[in-house]
Regions:
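Extended, hydrophobic alpha-helical segments in both membrane/secreted and soluble proteins
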Residues: 174, 194-198, 206, 212, ...
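Glycine-rich phosphate/diphosphate-binding loops that line cofactor/substrate pockets in enzymes
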Residues: 165-169, 301-307, 349-356, 462-467, ...
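Structural preference for beta-rich elements and adjacent junctions enriched in aromatics
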Residues: 1-345, 370, 726
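Conserved structural-core and active-site-/substrate-pathway-adjacent residues in large, well-folded domains
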Residues: 18, 50, 107, 174, ...
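Exposed, low-structure sequence patches enriched in small/polar residues
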Residues: 292-294, 300, 373, 386-748
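Outer-membrane beta-barrel transmembrane domain signature of Gram-negative proteins
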Residues: 143-165, 319-386, 503-545, 572, ...
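Generic short beta-strand segments
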Residues: 21-25, 176-181, 363, 474-478, ...
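Structural motif corresponding to the C-terminal cap of alpha-helices
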Residues: 180-182, 349-351, 382, 560, ...
Length: 748
C-alpha cells in the first residue's frame, strides 16, 4: 500500500485522458532526477507509463511516459522495445504534481498521436506501469510473466470507446539552421539552410513520413577508431528519420551472422576518388565526398489483417570531382557516383497465433549506370501457442552485377526452448562465397557456416540474496561453406547474477581452438593460422540508483602455442562512473584501455605474395558527458571524446604460405612505414530548449581535431600534446525545429 497506484482513463471526441495517483512513503526524498526527453529509464527518478495497442494485435503499440521530474517520453514499437523506438516524437500533454502522499500525473493524448481502425466500437490493448526507482522494480497493471511472454504480448483490454473517428493526422516540421565555421588564420565561413519534414496519415493505419529538403547538420559525431582489420567500421545511425519506426526494417538482423540487412548509413555515405579515375600527372582540385540527399520518404503501418508494411525510398545526387592535369593545367569534371536511388521494403504477416510471423524484406540500390545491388530476405519466426518454443528459419539472396556475376545465398535455422529453469538453443547458418549485402546493408561473412548449441539455467524467482541468476554453456563450430573445412571450434561458460542491493556481476570464460582466419589475408581462399586461446571476462556494476555509481569490465585473451616464440596477449580494461551532484547536475566518465601484444596483422599484398607484420597495439579512449538541467525542458550538455591508438611494428616481416603458416621475409621489401599513431578529439556543447510540444531550439558548439602519423614513440599524453599543436576548427550552429499539428491549427 505504500506504493499504491490508481489510474483513470477518459475520452471525448478529441483525445484520450489519463490520470494517475502514485503513493510514495517519503515524497520528500523520492528520486526526481532531470533528464532529456525520452531518457526516462536509466535515470534516478520514478516513471509512470501507459501503452495502447490500438489494433489489439499484441505487437504494435504506442507508449507515453513521464518521470517524477516532469520529463516526458513517447515510443512506438513493433515487438520488443528497442532504443531507436524512443526516437518517435509526437504531440501530447503531460504534467506531474508532487504532494504529501506522493505524486500525480495528468496526460492528454490527442487521437492524432495514435493510429487506430475506423469503426464504431474500439477494442484496444492497454497497460499501465510504474518504475519505482528506490526499489529497482517496475510494476504493471496487466501482469507480464517475464519467463514466458514479453511486454507487448501481455496487454489488458480497454473497452467502451465508441463513435470516435480517426482525425486527419498531418504534421509539418519546418526547420531553419545557420552555421559559422572559424579557424585561426583563415577567413570565417557561414551557411544557412531551411527545409521541412512532413508526417501524414494516409489512412487510419498507415503514415507517410517525408523529408522534403533533408539536412542533418547537428547529428552526433561518430566514434571513429583506428581500423586495422579487414572490415569497415560500422557506425550507429544518428539521423532520426532513419531510426524512427526502424523495427520493421530490422526483422532479418538478429542472430545467424547478424549484420544489418538494411544499413541506413549507406544512404549518403562518403565516396572517394579511386586510382582508376586519375590519369598520369593528375590531381583532384575540387571534391565534396558526401552526396547530397535530395529527398526521402517512408510509409509504415499495419492492416486489419495484421500485415505490417514498411517502405523507404531515398535519392542522392550525383557526385563530381574537379581534376587538373599538372603538366597542361587543363581541368575536367568527372562523375564519381551518379544519382542513386535506394528502396527498402518490409512485409511482416502475423499468423497462427499472436506471436508468430512470416516476413519478406527487399533492399535495392540502383544508379543511372545500372543496378548496384538487390537483396531479398525471408524470415519465418514461429512460436507454439503456449510460447514455450521458438523455431526460426531465414533465407537470403543477393544480386550484385557490378561485383559478382553469380547470385549469392545464405540461410539459417534455429530452435529454442523459452520456458523453465533449463533452456536450450540449437542453430546453424551458412553463407556461400557469392553472397553480398553491403550495397545497402552490412555483412562481413563469406564462404562460412556455423553450428552452435547453448544450454542455460536461470532462477525464475528471487532466491536469498539473488534477484536474478543465470549460467550457461555454449559450444560452436565454424567451417567453410563449400568445402566444410574447419575454421575453429570453441566453448564458453558464464555466470550472470544480480543481488538484492542492485549490484550486478558477470564472469565469463571461453576457449577457442587454433583458427584458420580467411579474412585477414584479404585474398579469396587464403588463410592465416591463429593460435588457440583462453578468454576471461569479469564485470562488476554498482547500484545505479546511488549518487555515485560505477561499472568495471576486464577482458583477457591468453594465447599459447604461438609461432616464432611470440607472446601474444590481449587485455582490455573499461571503467565508467556516474556522479549526480544534484537532481539537475551530473557527470559521467568512461575510460577504455587496450593493450595487445605481438598481434600479427596484414600489411600488403603484391601479386600472389601476402605480407604480415608483428605489432603492439595500445589504445585509450576517454569520454566525458556532463549535463545541467534548468528544468525538464531546458538543459546544457557537454560531450567530449578523445581516442588514441598506437600500432608499433617490430622490424620483422612475414610472408604467408599456402598452408596458413608464416615465413620470415626481408623487412627491406616493405616500401612504407606501417607504424601508426592515431588521435582524434571531438567535443559538442549544446543548449536545448523544448519551448512547445514537439518544437525545440538547439545552440551547438563543436570542434574536432584529428591526426594520424608514424610517431609511435609518443605515449598518450605526448600524442595528445602533438594533436593540440594543430589549428582547431570551431563551429557554431543554431537550429530551430517547429512542429505544426494541422488539427490544433484548424481548431484555432
Amino acid at each position: 500500500e505504500e506504493y499504491e497506484t490508481t489510474t483513470y482513463v477518459g475520452y471525448d471526441q478529441n483525445a484520450i485522458y489519463v490520470g494517475a495517483i502514485l503513493k510514495h512513503p517519503n515524497p520528500n526524498i523520492m528520486p526526481k532526477e532531470f533528464s532529456q526527453r525520452d531518457e526516462i529509464w536509466d535515470v534516478n527518478a520514478e516513471t509512470f507509463f501507459v501503452t495502447f495497442n490500438t489494433y489489439n494485435d499484441d505487437l504494435n503499440f504506442f507508449g507515453f511516459q513521464i518521470t517524477s521530474a516532469g520529463t516526458v517520453g513517447d515510443v512506438y514499437s513493433s515487438g520488443s522495445i528497442e532504443s531507436d523506438d524512443f526516437l518517435y516524437d509526437t504531440i501530447f500533454d503531460a504534467k506531474t504534481h508532487i504532494n504529501s502522499d506522493g505524486w500525480s500525473v495528468e496526460m492528454v493524448i490527442p487521437y492524432s498521436a495514435l493510429r487506430f481502425p475506423k469503426k464504431e466500437v474500439q477494442l484496444w490493448g492497454l497497460n499501465f506501469g510504474r518504475k519505482i526507482q528506490s526499489l529497482g522494480e517496475t510494476y504493471v497493471w496487466s501482469p507480464v510473466n517475464v519467463n514466458e511472454l514479453e511486454y507487448h504480448e501481455s496487454n489488458g483490454t480497454l473497452n467502451g470507446i465508441e463513435n470516435v473517428s480517426p482525425p486527419v493526422r498531418l504534421f509539418f516540421y519546418p526547420y531553419v539552421q545557420t552555421s559559422v565555421n572559424l579557424r585561426k588564420g583563415e577567413k570565417s565561413t557561414s551557411s544557412y539552410t531551411a527545409g521541412m519534414d512532413l508526417k501524414y496519415g494516409l489512412s487510419s493505419s498507415f503514415t507517410l513520413d517525408a523529408s522534403l529538403i533533408p539536412d542533418f547538420g547537428q547529428v552526433a559525431f561518430d566514434n571513429v577508431e583506428l581500423n586495422l582489420g579487414p572490415f569497415e567500421q560500422q557506425f550507429s545511425e544518428n539521423r532520426a528519420f532513419f531510426t524512427e519506426g526502424a523495427t520493421l526494417f530490422e526483422i532479418a538482423d538478429e542472430g545467424m551472422g547478424g549484420g544489418s540487412f538494411f544499413y541506413s548509413r549507406r544512404i549518403g555515405e562518403e565516396v572517394s576518388v579511386g586510382d582508376d579515375i586519375l590519369e598520369n600527372d593528375e590531381q583532384v582540385y575540387d571534391f565534396d565526398s558526401t552526396p547530397q540527399l535530395l529527398n526521402t520518404i517512408k510509409v509504415t503501418g499495419t492492416t486489419n489483417k495484421n500485415l505490417s508494411i514498411g517502405f523507404l525510398n531515398a535519392i542522392t545526387d550525383k557526385v563530381e570531382a574537379g581534376i587538373e592535369n599538372l603538366s597542361s593545367n587543363q581541368r575536367r569534371r568527372q562523375t564519381i557516383q551518379p544519382l542513386v536511388n535506394y528502396n527498402v521494403l518490409s512485409l511482416s504477416q502475423q499468423l497462427l497465433n499472436d506471436y508468430s510471423s512470416i516476413s519478406v524484406l527487399n533492399t535495392n540500390k540502383a544508379g543511372n549506370d545500372g543496378l548496384y545491388g538487390n537483396n531479398l530476405a525471408f524470415v519465418a519466426d514461429m512460436f507454439d501457442n503456449k510460447r514455450g518454443f521458438n523455431f526460426k528459419v531465414k533465407a537470403f539472396g543477393s544480386k550484385t552485377p557490378k561485383e559478382n556475376s553469380t547470385n549469392g545465398f545464405r540461410t539459417g535455422i534455429s530452435l529454442s526452448e523459452l520456458k523453465g529453469n533449463f533452456r536450450y538453443n540449437f542453430s546453424w547458418w551458412g553463407v556461400d562465397k557469392h553472397y553480398k549485402q553491403n550495397e545497402l546493408g552490412y555483412f562481413n561473412y563469406s564462404d562460412h557456416q556455423s553450428f552452435s548449441s547453448r544450454i542455460s539455467y536461470q532462477i525464475l524467482k528471487e532466491y536469498g540474496i539473488l534477484r536474478e541468476y543465470r549460467n550457461y554453456l555454449w559450444f560452436h563450430d565454424t567451417r567453410t561453406f563449400h568445402s566444410s573445412e574447419r575454421k575453429l571450434w570453441g566453448l564458453r561458460f558464464g555466470n550472470d547474477f544480480s543481488t538484492q542491493n542492485l549490484m550486478v556481476f558477470e564472469a565469463d570464460f571461453a576457449y577457442s581452438s587454433r583458427t584458420r582466419d580467411y579474412d585477414k589475408p584479404r585474398t579469396i581462399n587464403r588463410y592465416i593460422e591463429e593460435p588457440e586461446n583462453f578468454q576471461a571476462k569479469l564485470v562488476v556494476q554498482s547500484n545505479k540508483n546511488k549518487d555515485l555509481s560505477y561499472r568495471f569490465q576486464w577482458n583477457n585473451f591468453a594465447y599459447f602455442n604461438e609461432d616464432y616464440n611470440e607472446k601474444k596477449s590481449q587485455n582490455r580494461f573499461n571503467i565508467s562512473t556516474l556522479y549526480r551532484f544534484s537532481e539537475k547536475f551530473s557527470i559521467a566518465l568512461k575510460s577504455n584501455h587496450l593493450n595487445f601484444k605481438d598481434d600479427v596483422g596484414f600489411l600488403e599484398s603484391i601479386n600472389q605474395d601476402i605480407y604480415f607484420g608483428r605489432r603492439d597495439i595500445r589504445s585509450v579512449e576517454n569520454n566525458i558527458d556532463l549535463s545541467y538541467f534548468f528544468d525538464s525542458k531546458k538543459w546544457i550538455n557537454l560531450r567530449l571524446r578523445n581516442y588514441w591508438s598506437r600500432a608499433k611494428y617490430d622490424p620483422i616481416l612475414f610472408s604467408l604460405n599456402d598452408n596458413g603458416k608464416r615465413t620470415q621475409a626481408d623487412y627491406l621489401d616493405l616500401d612504407f612505414d606501417p607504424d601508426t599513431n592515431f588521435n582524434i578529439w571531438n567535443i559538442d556543447i549544446n543548449f536545448e530548449w523544448w519551448f512547445a510540444p514537439g518544437s525545440n531550439l538547439v545552440l551547438l558548439y563543436r570542434n574536432q581535431l584529428f591526426k594520424s602519423d608514424n610517431a609511435t614513440d609518443l605515449d598518450y599524453f605526448g600524442s595528445l600534446n602533438n594533436l593540440f599543436n594543430q589549428t582547431t576548427q570551431h563551429q557554431f550552429s543554431l537550429r530551430l525545429n517547429y512542429l505544426i499539428d494541422y488539427n490544433r491549427t484548424r481548431k484555432k
